Each structure stands twice: as structure tokens, then as C-alpha cells.
């Protein structure tokens, strides 16, 4: 059906992106949720309070997913490689669900329904919402939309385009494990070390590509490309994450808001440096962040196809 592997991959990536835009994540039976349950079951066997045990745990899961992806990509049939690439890309993306949740939190905060916004926030990030009021919920949601623009939108597309089904499924496995065990809590400080470091590596290039796209797309929401570059260069290194800081700083500068500060998780309170030098984010800024995130995903889809064509034999 298609003349070469690169055409197959390009078409599959675009179809997968379209599936995410149209359908989003299913409420039941999502492959990432199934993987998460399997990882939790395996943890009951592999858990030891040490880095080696954590590395074994991550290696088994990511290796299994990568082998599954390689097998799917090599099944016979002219249409199957496109279907496999499209399905894997769709499973790894989460842009539509991210935007939907961001808009729902915006709606709740505009109605001053803080309790409902608190209940919804954990579906977006791992923050402890119990002590957060409207401004804190707004900042937490905006920071999560920014960070997940890379994790759930741009980076999966780049891995799918550059290396195919095994890579994009392996990336989603790594990112899911980081969200499950990559914390500095007493239980996971050592066991989750490998997941956290591998996630840093897997997102390094993609996070910076995301920041570049934020700079380019900022005018769509009335944002400042110059402000995005300034905050990125000045503030990103202050963030405890080498990747989230890049994207969050770019969003802060583009939207002329100030992010960072006290950040409470269930296991600890982090006092983070500020990113950007604008105003405290308002609900309208959260809405702008959601729109910017979606535009960045569209830009990433174009970039992914360009990457496939550039790598063709």
C-alpha cells in the first residue's frame, strides 16, 4: 500500500494523532491503565528498598513492552504496520484528555467550586489538593498542563516518528513508571531511582523541542515568544526536574505569569524557585495554556512527519 517504511510510519503517526484528537482516552480498558495495573502487580514481587531492584523492575516492564512493540511492527500484511503505528501512537498520546481536564478545572474555578476542582486535580497531577484554594489550584493545573504538553503530546510523537512502535510504547512505559514510582518518598527514593533517571533521559530532547514549539506558537494565544525564551534561559535550571523546568518556564514566559513556589505532594512539601516574572496565574491564563498546549501538539505532529521524511533512506 505504501512505497516505503518511512511513508508507513508518517501515515501511522498522523492517524494516531487524529485518533487522539477525535476520541481521546477511553474511560475503560486504556492500554496505559492496563500496563499500570500490571506494573503494580509486578511490584509486589520485585520490590526491595534498593536501586538494583528498581532497575530490574523497570527493565522487565520496559523490555517486555519494547519486545511487544517490535513484534507488532513486524507482523505480515501491507496495512498492518500503519495500523500498529497508529494504535501505538494513539495509546501513547494524552492531549485530548489533558485539554478536557484543564478546561473542566477552569470551568469549576470560574464557578468558585473549589471542592470539585480539588477532586479533579489528582487526575491531572500528583499534587495534594487538600490545602489548595483557587489560586493554588490554578497554578497547579497550569503547571501540569505545561509539563504534560511534553510528556503526553510532543515527546510520544517524536519517539514514534524517529524509532517506530517499540520506541513509542517503551517511552510510554517509562513515563508511566516514573509517575508511579519516580518519587522521592521513603518507599521509592531508591526503588524509583531508575525510573526517574530513565524518564529524564527519554524526555531530554523532546522537552526542549516542546519549549521551541511554545516559543513559536505563543502568539496564537496572545503570548510573547521573547518572554518564553527569556524565562526558559533564565529560570529553567532552577527547577528540580531537568525537563519539566524547561517547558514550565517557557509557558510562564509565553503567558506572562509566575509559576513555582510552595508545591505540596502527598509525601513532601517542595519549595520551588519561581519561573517567569509575570502575574500570578488566573483562570483565563489556564484556559490560554490549554489552547497553547493543543496548538503545540499540532506543531509537533508536523515536526514528527518532517522528522520521518528526513530519516528516510
Curated annotation (Swiss-Prot):
Keywords: Cell membrane, Cobalamin biosynthesis, Membrane, Transmembrane, Transmembrane helix. It comes from the Bacteria. GO terms for cellular component: extracellular region; plasma membrane. InterPro entries: Cobalamin_biosynth_CobD/CbiB. Its main location: membrane. GO terms for biological process: cobalamin biosynthetic process. It is a multi-pass membrane protein. The chain crosses the membrane at residues 52-72, 79-99, 154-174, 204-224, 289-309. It is found in: Cell membrane. One of its GO terms (molecular function) is ABC-type vitamin B12 transporter activity. Belongs to the CobD/CbiB family. Converts cobyric acid to cobinamide by the addition of aminopropanol on the F carboxylic group. This is Cobalamin biosynthesis protein CobD. The gene is cobD.
